[in-house]
């Protein structure tokens, strides 16, 4: 097992500047500052429930819109996860979690296959939470999937409170990822009949 499963990405555009580091074999330690309080909250939950250590510093044109910052942070998270996973030797590969948050229940199933695909079935009524546009939840996971090479299925099984719905989704993603990145000691190589992911 690689004892240094860490990915770090810096991204600078005319719209945003992001520095992100993720450590897969962590304890859920986090330092997060994105200028978007609700996204800070969700990334904190992701770190805590995945047990991945996460450091994020992001500055962007949030006075215009939060979309650029949300998407670029997700791009960096996806790239950092891909870097940290390396050749994926010994990983469990698949993860699934169903997580409640009061009246809401979300399910996330994922495969660290190297093939990016997002299925997203999460209807929400509220358009904004603070300065965070809820439509960007989909954009966030689309960017993570595309840049990490993950197949992610996200389904809202029930729910009415938008904050609770998004929180359940992020927690379920974190728990599913936690399982998928675990090392299976009996698997000496890559857990694929093709021997590559």
Curated annotation (Swiss-Prot):
It catalyses: D-erythro-1-(imidazol-4-yl)glycerol 3-phosphate = 3-(imidazol-4-yl)-2-oxopropyl phosphate + H2O. Keywords: Amino-acid biosynthesis, Cytoplasm, Histidine biosynthesis, Lyase. InterPro entries: IGPD_sf, ImidazoleglycerolP_deHydtase, ImidazoleglycerP_deHydtase_CS, Ribosomal_Su5_D2-typ_SF. It is found in: Cytoplasm. It comes from the Bacteria. The keyword Cytoplasm applies. It holds the Pfam family IGPD. CDD domains: IGPD. It is an enzyme of class 4 (lyase). Signal peptide: none annotated. Pathway: Amino-acid biosynthesis; L-histidine biosynthesis; L-histidine from 5-phospho-alpha-D-ribose 1-diphosphate: step 6/9. Its EC number is 4.2.1.19. GO terms for cellular component: cytoplasm. One of its GO terms (molecular function) is imidazoleglycerol-phosphate dehydratase activity. GO terms for biological process: L-histidine biosynthetic process. Belongs to the imidazoleglycerol-phosphate dehydratase family. NCBIfam families: PRK00951.2-1 (NF002111), PRK00951.2-4 (NF002114). This is Imidazoleglycerol-phosphate dehydratase. It comes from Syntrophomonas wolfei subsp. wolfei (strain DSM 2245B / Goettingen). The gene is hisB.
